Amino acid sequence: MQNNSTSFPTAIFLMGPTASGKTDLAIKLHETLPVEIISVDSALIYKGMDIGTAKPSKEELALAPHRLIDILDPAESYSAMNFRADALREMTDITAQGKIPLLVGGTMLYYKALIEGLSPLPNADEKIRSEIEARAQQTGWAVLHQELAKIDPASAARINPNDSQRINRALEVFYLTGKSLTELTAQKGDALPYNVLQFAIAPEDRSILHERIELRFKKMVELGFKAEVEKLYARSDLSPDLPSIRCVGYRQMWEHLRGDYGFDEAIYRGICATRQLAKRQITWLRGWKTPIRWLNSLQNEKNQKKIQQVFYLSMQNR
């Protein structure tokens, strides 16, 4: 869990759904506070995926550099565990320079991993996964779900009998460790050694967010989003099974290039998928376990002042 002790250095979290104005506000804060920005975004980590991720422009990055952007090729995978290790390293470096880490983004799972620590879950084992898949082909996933119910009733109650991926993972964890997924996830890792000031930004009216998402997606298309995905599609080492290609927008454009549906349909589906992502992000934030100060996307100047006031007040109380 997060530490609130004043003996710990300060960090700022600026969270929010996609298209809520996080980047613009972060750049403004970089101009007025002694902060260095760390990206908390599972799409911005990939090189060559600039337009569809709304990655900060070269000009914006020159004004306010973002760490943990463009660190991986799209063929590579990246986990919450990878992020936590990388983010803690960057936070330590920023703190050592006498500055404040400002973590900005909308990948809520990464924030959760950073604040709460990670359960000691084993890495995937392809051999065991293949064996489980083979059994499922013979008996059906419903039978394996019944097996899971005997091993781990709590997980079985949460997992739909048709959710093959989650059934496979829960059984895999048990076969590897001899312990249930429920038991292992109850064990948390180390607490975050920072006093975190948490902010979330979003429009008060969700229809405004929906409109912004549509306008931004159409702007991406004008800027050459399809051509960007075409370059990825031409690579033999990329597929829609990879996390990079599953990113909203990219998946829909990829399916269009594959011939699944037309260009206009890809745009429509991309907008819908982005809105669904925003809804999930807001749901995460509404259920956040630690205190969050909410900001209105339409009041950026006021938001900047509010964060400054909270920051300086926290520093006075140290």
Curated annotation (Swiss-Prot):
GO function term, MF aspect, one: tRNA dimethylallyltransferase activity
NCBIfam families given in the database record: miaA
Protein residues bound to substrate: 18-23
Keyword tRNA processing carried by entry: yes
UniProt-recorded name of the protein: tRNA dimethylallyltransferase
Biological source species: Actinobacillus succinogenes (strain ATCC 55618 / DSM 22257 / CCUG 43843 / 130Z)
Function: Catalyzes the transfer of a dimethylallyl group onto the adenine at position 37 in tRNAs that read codons beginning with uridine, leading to the formation of N6-(dimethylallyl)adenosine (i(6)A).
Residues binding ATP, per UniProt: 16-23
Reaction(s) this enzyme catalyzes, per UniProt: adenosine(37) in tRNA + dimethylallyl diphosphate = N(6)-dimethylallyladenosine(37) in tRNA + diphosphate
Subunit structure: Monomer.
Gene name per UniProt: miaA
